[in-house]
Amino acid sequence: MSERDAVKTIVTPFLVHGICKTEAEALGMLARDYAQRQVTRYAERVAHFRSVYQTSLDQFADQVRALCGARGEIAALARLAKAAQIVQAEDDLEEWEAAERFLARWQAVETDLRNAAAA
């Protein structure tokens, strides 16, 4: 199946059932909806980490560096042994950084799609 055929297969139900008038309208609607759901997904992930650690990403990164250097602790991980705290903190830091990166990227996509629709 060619790319064009794949696009037709995806958008045809939107046209047949009168949800959209053109392929471009259907593709735009799908793209905007998907981007918005991704923004929500990553915003929720970022909010989760902020809630758990009660701090910003930059401050958490500083806390993780201090923890790894045996100069600090992270209250949210106090229930764990020191080695487990380090592993969990490093894992969460990596996930949090990725969530922030993808949130920014999806927000940019969402803005671009909104601007394109307004043009």
Where do the model's predicted regions map?
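Extended, charge-rich alpha-helical interface modules
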Residues: 2-119
